[in-house]
């Protein structure tokens, strides 16, 4: 079955509406939607997001869901529950602390420093089919680190799914180089006059259209 990008990345209406109506553009790269997505969580919306991501992931026949703490856990858990799959999340440690596990160092924008992602190798069985789920795809550092650990464990990344994607950052291009199919429920193409534009969704900015 050939999967078309439109199915994988078409806007999810309940989410797109909330972003357009309530999203706060902080600067040319930061969109705050923490009052319903990743700080205070609208559980009804998150449940719907989980069902939608699980539906789009279904053709890839994933055997487990992988994410990183902390903001990746809510959408990953909602997806895992909807898909009836186990969930594994990478824990964050001080980079100077040795951890007997699969590890990668990444820069954390929220903490503004290096952190160490760690996963117990026994939770990523060799040969398993893994789907990465996270709240945002921006620079792609977290997703790439998770993918590297999956490959080190001898498993396969079958897809990477995100609630929100910032198209104007390099995350998608980096993941595409690995050949990983990408799912996103809202692709932010740019910010205009302090408002986000979502690909394939009617704009609230006069005279502007994206897709």
UniProtKB/Swiss-Prot annotation:
Disulfide bonds: none
Enzyme Commission designation: 2.4.2.22
A Pfam family recorded for this sequence: Pribosyltran
GO CC annotations on file: cytoplasm
The keyword Glycosyltransferase appears for this protein: yes
Entry annotated with the keyword Methyltransferase: no
Positions bound to xanthine: 31, 38, 166
UniProt keywords, alphabetically: Cytoplasm, Glycosyltransferase, Purine salvage, Transferase
UniProt-annotated binding residues for 5-phospho-alpha-D-ribose 1-diphosphate: 138-142
Any one GO molecular-function label of the UniProt entry: xanthine phosphoribosyltransferase activity
Function, in words: Converts the preformed base xanthine, a product of nucleic acid breakdown, to xanthosine 5'-monophosphate (XMP), so it can be reused for RNA or DNA synthesis.
Family the UniProt entry places it in: Belongs to the purine/pyrimidine phosphoribosyltransferase family. Xpt subfamily.
Protein known as: Xanthine phosphoribosyltransferase
Organism of derivation: Chloroflexus aurantiacus (strain ATCC 29366 / DSM 635 / J-10-fl)
